[in-house]
Amino acid sequence: MSFCYVRTISIALFLFIFLFLNNGNFKNNFYRKDNKYSSIKIRSFRSLAENQKVETEQSTPAKPEPTEFVNNDIHQNKNTFKKLKNNEKKKEILEEKMKDFVKLYVNKSSGECQRYRLQQHLKNYSSSNEYKKFMNKFVKFLKVHNDLNALKSQLHFNNVRAATIIFIAGFLSIFAILLTISAVAATSKFTNNMLAIAGVGALGSALSLPGMALLFVPAMLYVLNRKNEITNHYSERIIKQVSNF
């Protein structure tokens, strides 16, 4: 009887311990699952809140810049545009001035008034930094142009000299021929001697043609040599100046 009683108590105690342990495991599992579910739920709510924050930041328009900065930018843009426009206008005006006094010098450089105006143009615009290089080249061009004009004038004068010599030689030759004809005619009136008439004609021919040639050939040779000297002198100067461009 006592043995059965002890066995019953031990079985009941064992069942009680078993049930208690199972109940603790169940609670632990439940709390673990609950904590796991809570952490998942918290993470999901946190990510949802962050997404909503990003969407609100993207949807909200950016704050406009202060009107002072915008006005300053507009003012600076206007000033730069005005400066560019003024520089372009100045450049166009200076280019027109350059073209004008280039034409003035090339076309009308013979007059003293035009030369004075050209010198004034050079004084006014030679100090411009933008056109210093151009002005240097232009001055070199003026030197070449002056040398070409001097060469043309010297050659023209030399040609006039040669033409004058030829004209004088031709005139004197014709005059000598006419004088010879008149002398032959006068001799034929006074005498019928053909030898005398032929002698007068030969003397007149010798004076008119070879005599004039001997007189004017040195002058023509001098003119030709002078032409060669002028051409060589100015050609060397022009070549040196052109090589400095």
Swiss-Prot record:
Residues 186-196 are extracellular. Residues 52-71 are annotated as: Disordered. Potential vaccine candidate as CBP2-based peptides or antibodies against CBP2 prevent adhesion of infected erythrocytes to endothelial cells. Residues 26-164, 218-245 are cytoplasmic. The chain crosses the membrane at residues 165-185, 197-217. Residues 46-50 are annotated as: PEXEL motif. Disruption phenotype: At the asexual blood stage, causes Maurer's cleft swelling and fragmentation, aberrant knob formation, with fewer and enlarged knobs, defective PfEMP1 trafficking characterized by impaired EMP1 surface expression and EMP1 accumulation at Maurer's clefts and a loss of adhesion of host infected erythrocytes to endothelial cell ligands. Infected erythrocytes have decreased cellular rigidity and increased osmotic fragility. Parasite growth is faster. Keywords: ATP-binding, Disulfide bond, Host cell membrane, Host membrane, Membrane, Nucleotide-binding, Signal, Transmembrane, Transmembrane helix. The keyword Transmembrane helix applies. One of its GO terms (cellular component) is membrane. Its main location: host cell. It is a multi-pass membrane protein. The first cytoplasmic domain binds ATP and nucleic acids such as RNA and DNA in vitro. During the asexual blood stage and probably at the ring/trophozoite stages, plays a role in Maurer's cleft formation and/or morphology. Also, involved in the loading of the virulence factor EMP1 into the Maurer's cleft membrane. By binding to host chemokine CX3CL1, mediates the cytoadherence of host erythrocytes infected with parasite mature forms (late trophozoite and schizont) to endothelial cells, which sequesters them away from the circulation and thus prevents their elimination by the host spleen. This is CX3CL1-binding protein 2. It comes from Plasmodium falciparum (isolate 3D7). The gene is CBP2.
